[in-house]
Every structure is written in C-alpha cells, then in structure tokens.
C-alpha cells in the first residue's frame, strides 16, 4: 500500500482517488483524535475532536507563579483543594513513593521526568496524597498532561507548574490552593 492519500498520485505508484477526509472539530468526542487507514485506493479518515480548555488555577501565600498552571487530561475535571505541599520521595514519582506518612492528606510535589504523568499521580494517590503538583523540567510554560496508561485509575487532581516555581513551593509549610473547572 502506497498510503499516499491523494486524488492523483502523479504516476508515483499506488491507487489514486483516495484523498484524505479530515474532520476538524468533530463533536462526537472530546480531548482526542483518531484516524482510520483503509487499504490503498480507499480514502482514509481523520477525526480531530474538540479539546476542552479547562480553567486551572493555583495560589499560595507568598508564591507568584511564573506561568499559569496547566491541567491534566485525567482525574477530576472540577476541583477545589487546599492542602500543604510535600515533596514526594523519590522526587520523580515513577515508582512507589517512600514517604507516604508525610504525604497523607497533602499535595505531593513531583518532578517531571521519564515516566508518564498518570503513573506519577497514581503513585502519589496510593501514598495518600490528595492532589499533585508536577514541576516542569524545562524553563518554559507548563504543558497539559495526557492521561497515559493509568489515567482512568486516578481519582485526585493534578496540575503542572513552571520549573522556576519549584523553590517557592518547596520552602516548607507552603499551603496551596488548586482549583479546576471543566467549564
């Protein structure tokens, strides 16, 4: 199969007449996209769903955030949570956390790293955390976090903040308010 998805292949092989059908802002779903790729000669179809731009906010006394926080595409969409921030151990959150006694009822601060976001948040949830702040690992704006393999198992909210915000959040005794809205 040539997989060229166009009406005229200009003599370069494959069957013609299979122009791609791209459906932008398809309202049959949200926060996703898919593509069907039939055999050569039949038109492929791409559906790009509407992405929900939820509002995510964070505030803490004495903390000025570099960028607005970003939300997660998993866990609760609407939340309003206030708790003390505690650094997770290990800080990348990729394995079971070892400081569950300190995290119980708190917001876990986890560094962005090599494993998927939902694995980090699930590990914090299993350690007793009520929310998660993931700190970006590059000096740029936080990015929305995809659900990954464990997204459907996560029941606590998560946000991402800028790398520059880490020192203020790890100063000790910081009480953070995290808010999310699905509107």
Say what each PLM segment does.
Residues 1-55, 181-183:
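Extracellular zinc-dependent metalloprotease catalytic-domain scaffold
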